[in-house]
Amino acid sequence: MVRRFLVTLRIRRACGPPRVRVFVVHIPRLTGEWAAPGAPAAVALVLMLLRSQRLGQQPLPRRPGHDDGQRPSGGAAAAPRRGAQLRRPRHSHPTRARRCPGGLPGHAGGAAPGRGAAGRARCLGPSARGPG
């Protein structure tokens, strides 16, 4: 024998009208000493499902007065970014503009191929001026 219960929940909200949820619960009713309890078990089951569903949707609780400015305080979420905004180059200048004439910065000892001592001297700085 299957018992059907119609469970209506009124969820109070901080702003706006209360939200009304209606569930139909089917509970198989066994006969004998191991019989399933009636209406209280159905209500407890629905409340447990509703709480677990609600816990998965809520963000972490924030303490009042500890807003670090990282999250928007309004209810509207930020608009999703489009692909063109996400695919910017990591550096604003092309590769050659980041290099000094003698090769990569920080690699002053090894000059770029095809360049002489003058190219290296431009990268090394004041110690490469020679005697005097």
Curated annotation (Swiss-Prot):
Its main location: nucleus. Residues 71-83 have a biased composition (Low complexity). GO terms for molecular function: disordered domain specific binding; DNA binding; MDM2/MDM4 family protein binding; p53 binding; RNA polymerase II-specific DNA-binding transcription factor binding; SUMO transferase activity; ubiquitin ligase inhibitor activity; ubiquitin-protein transferase inhibitor activity. Residues 1-64 are annotated as: Interaction with CDK5RAP3 and MDM2. Pfam families: P19Arf_N. Residues 84-99 have a biased composition (Basic residues). The keyword Cell cycle applies. GO terms for biological process: amyloid fibril formation; apoptotic signaling pathway; autophagy of mitochondrion; cellular senescence; mitochondrial depolarization; negative regulation of B cell proliferation; negative regulation of cell population proliferation; negative regulation of immature T cell proliferation in thymus. Keywords: Apoptosis, Cell cycle, DNA-binding, Mitochondrion, Nucleus, rRNA processing, Transcription, Transcription regulation, Tumor suppressor, Ubl conjugation, Ubl conjugation pathway. It is found in: Nucleus, Nucleolus; Nucleus, Nucleoplasm. GO terms for cellular component: cytosol; mitochondrial matrix; mitochondrion; nucleolus; nucleoplasm; nucleus; protein-containing complex. The keyword rRNA processing applies. It comes from the Eukaryota. Residues 56-132 are annotated as: Disordered. Ubiquitinated in normal cells by TRIP12 via the ubiquitin fusion degradation (UFD) pathway, a process that mediates ubiquitination at the N-terminus, regardless of the absence of lysine residues. Ubiquitination leads to its proteasomal degradation. In cancer cells, however, TRIP12 is located in a different cell compartment, preventing ubiquitination and degradation. Residues 103-117 have a biased composition (Gly residues). InterPro entries: Tumor_suppres_ARF. Capable of inducing cell cycle arrest in G1 and G2 phases. Acts as a tumor suppressor. Binds to MDM2 and blocks its nucleocytoplasmic shuttling by sequestering it in the nucleolus. This inhibits the oncogenic action of MDM2 by blocking MDM2-induced degradation of p53 and enhancing p53-dependent transactivation and apoptosis. Also induces G2 arrest and apoptosis in a p53-independent manner by preventing the activation of cyclin B1/CDC2 complexes. Binds to BCL6 and down-regulates BCL6-induced transcriptional repression. This is Tumor suppressor ARF. It comes from Homo sapiens. The gene is CDKN2A.
